[in-house]
Design a protein with these regions (language model features):
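Nucleotide and nucleotide-moiety/phosphate-recognizing core
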Residues: 2-107, 118-133, 140-145, 152, ...
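Conserved TIR/SEFIR loop-to-helix hotspot centered on a Trp-containing motif
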Residues: 111
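Glycine-rich phosphate-binding loop at the start of an alpha helix
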Residues: 114
């Protein structure tokens, strides 16, 4: 059976719930609700996980209990625990360089300044071949404001827009399994471009 490990990045603790930096872990929780599965703690992966099946794919949802800057600890442990290759991992994370609620898929690449991705690449010994789902949170405008910006909660209107866009992106996981990576990317990005034009 094929496997796809989805890891939603964020910071643990109630004080970080619904902050911009936790967009990835928020998306995984939405998936859990959508597929009616519960997350269970697992010390060996430094986080919690849930599993379900789509066609012949075993889908594993994981949220690290490490802080964002140490995400690589959990991802490397989960990779070993679930016996998956890097290309079978989809990291879901917040993205400053995309406007609020914009969803993009990316097949490998660098860390782009994202400390969670930086940690993952470091703990995978430089391997950056894992896939990514980038959830736009917008940019504060000034680099000196980034830390406080990502660790704070968005406005009510921003939050609603982000939640609506993330909910509409939930079917992407099934599409990845049924239609494959390339077709799913083309469909997602073409629909986003049409929205931008309208």
């Amino acid at each position: 059976m094929n496997t796809l490990l989805l890891v939603g990045l964020g910071n643990p603790g109630k004080e970080y719930l619904n902050t911009r930096h936790n967009a990835g872990s928020d998306f995984v929780r939405m998936l859990c609700n959508d597929y009616q599965v519960s997350l269970a703690k697992e010390k060996l992966v430094h986080g919690c996980y849930a599993k379900f099946i789509i066609n012949d794919f075993s889908i594993i949802l994981c949220i690290p209990d490490t802080f964002m800057n140490e995400s690589g600890i959990s991802v490397s442990k989960a990779k070993k625990f679930f016996k998956v290759d890097s290309h079978e991992i989809l990291i879901i994370h917040d993205e400053l360089d995309l406007h609020n609620g914009c969803i993009r898929l990316k097949d490998s690449g660098g860390h782009g300044g994202h400390n969670g991705l930086r940690s993952i690449i470091d703990h995978l010994n430089g391997d950056s071949s894992f896939k990514r789902m980038r959830i736009g949170i917008g940019h504060p405008g000034k680099n000196k404001d980034i830390v406080s910006y990502v660790l704070n909660k968005p406005s009510e209107s921003e939050r609603k827009n982000m939640e609506d866009k993330m909910k509409s992106a939930l079917p992407l996981i099934e599409s990845l399994v049924i239609n494959g990576w390339e077709k799913t990317i083309m469909k997602l990005h073409s629909s986003e471009e049409k929205k931008d034009e309208s």
